[in-house]
Amino acid sequence: MASRNMNNVFVYCEIEGTQVQEVSQELLTKGRKLANELGVDLNAIVAGTGIKGKVEEQILPYGVDKLFVFDGEGLFPYTSAPHTDILVNLFKEEKPQICLMGATVIGRDLGPRVSSSLTSGLTADCTELEIGPYEDKKNQKTYDNLLYQIRQIGRASCRERVF
């Protein structure tokens, strides 16, 4: 398990009532793979009303090292402001390297808000995300970085934090 503030991989889990959505389960699987490749922890976030004790068994089996559960009035159904505040405050403290969100109505609303608030990178509509080599010829160094496949655009790479 990685130590605190090691730029872990995070997955934002979408829920409907107390049911974790399939897109989040898929992202947890990919998140575990990326975390293993990077040698960091996989953390998951879920926010809703009346969810504590009802969502953990749906999320933890995916190899999540730490689960952040935010349970309170006004967190379900989803609205932008409280969920953005939760993620921005958490990410300021935890400093994730990557946060995966679904390409859903919620993910497309929340991702840009969090990214803008933190002035971080945002890569939308990825169909593939992997760790690969990046050669900085100017500084004669090679880094492991993110390679991602975007619908209809092709392949690109990024060395900065991506949400």
Which stretches of residues belong to each language-model region?
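N-terminal glycine-rich FAD/FM-binding segment characteristic of electron-transfer flavoproteins
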Residues: M1-R161
